[in-house]
């Protein structure tokens, strides 16, 4: 084992250090995710997907597919860095309330932006239907996911903080298995409920259960970041680990595409959101793999990169 490497302690409960101030690289990573969403949605909304040539989709909608996965991963990372070490403290109820108030704020802006998105194209009755969760919009739905997640994630943070590593990894595996099983159910024909929980192919929204594993992976990365970020050698190892994992996942996507016999078709399928709702293997390998690579680059750049890309960092700090 290389020097300074610590063996994994599968049964030990985490003893997390308190954060040493705001980590600008996290804001930068979130800002990159939001920036990619803006590029993707601007083309969809202003140009229209039908008006974009097939291979015009690849540099725009193919490469921007990292955005939602990066946003969700950074959500978990930020919670770990800012809140996880405080879950056993006396002021945890106040911190939890802060997250819930943030959920209300995000939910308000989600609904306000939903009206703005739908107003030019839909009659009032359909907009009201969307406001009452009778249907979903498109471009603002990541905010709807974010608002709901901010309600339940604070409830499980104390349990997560007390769980040994094997329990946390088992939880991620169990949620993936639960998602696969729930995807096979019809939910009594209630497509909206299915979409909110595990995604539905006819609705452009992120399921809370189907995307929960990414939040929890973000928590694990956030724990590692707390231990590594302010030690240059450890941070370098973390960056290389994330970069390698991301590259392997993207390579896995291309291996599947090559095995299918038509790599360009596989790339166009991802660009056209095939496998996004509900999550499919190829899409998730590419999206999460790319997100991990972008995250690694943001962490490698650290405060200097955050300062050089200040507009993105500012966007990420306010999200």
Predicted regions and their residues:
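Alpha-helical transmembrane segments and their immediate juxtamembrane cytosolic regions
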Residues: 2-319
């Amino acid at each position: 084992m290389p020097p300074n490497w610590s063996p994994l302690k599968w049964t030990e409960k985490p003893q997390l250090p308190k954060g040493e101030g705001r980590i600008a690289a996290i804001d930068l990573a979130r800002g990159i995710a939001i920036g990619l969403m803006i590029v993707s949605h601007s083309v969809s909304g202003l140009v229209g997907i039908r008006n974009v040539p097939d291979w015009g989709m690849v540099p725009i909608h193919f490469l921007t597919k990292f955005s939602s996965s990066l946003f969700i991963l950074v959500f978990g990372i930020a919670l770990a860095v800012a809140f996880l070490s405080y879950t056993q403290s006396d002021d945890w109820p106040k911190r939890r309330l802060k997250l819930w108030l943030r959920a209300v704020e995000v939910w308000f802006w989600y609904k306000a932006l939903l009206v703005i998105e739908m107003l030019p194209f839909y009659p009032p009755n359909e907009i009201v239907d969307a406001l009452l969760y009778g249907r979903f919009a498109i471009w603002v739905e990541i905010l709807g996911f974010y608002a709901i997640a901010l309600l339940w994630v604070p409830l499980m943070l104390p349990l997560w903080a007390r769980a040994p590593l094997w329990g946390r990894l088992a939880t991620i595996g169990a949620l993936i298995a639960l998602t696969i099983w729930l995807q096979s159910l019809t939910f009594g024909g209630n497509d909206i409920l299915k979409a909110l929980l595990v995604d539905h192919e006819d609705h452009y929204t992120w399921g809370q259960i189907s995307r929960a594993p990414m939040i929890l992976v973000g928590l694990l990365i956030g724990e590692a970041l707390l231990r590594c970020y302010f030690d240059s050698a450890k941070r370098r190892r973390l960056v290389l680990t994330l970069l390698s994992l991301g590259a392997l996942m993207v390579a896995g996507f291309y291996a599947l595409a090559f095995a299918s016999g038509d790599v360009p078709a596989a790339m166009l399928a991802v660009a056209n959101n095939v496998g996004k709702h509900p999550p499919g293997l190829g899409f998730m390998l590419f999206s999460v793999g790319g997100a991990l690579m972008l995250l690694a680059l943001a962490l490698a750049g650290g405060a200097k990169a955050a300062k050089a890309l200040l507009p993105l960092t500012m966007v990420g700090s306010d999200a």
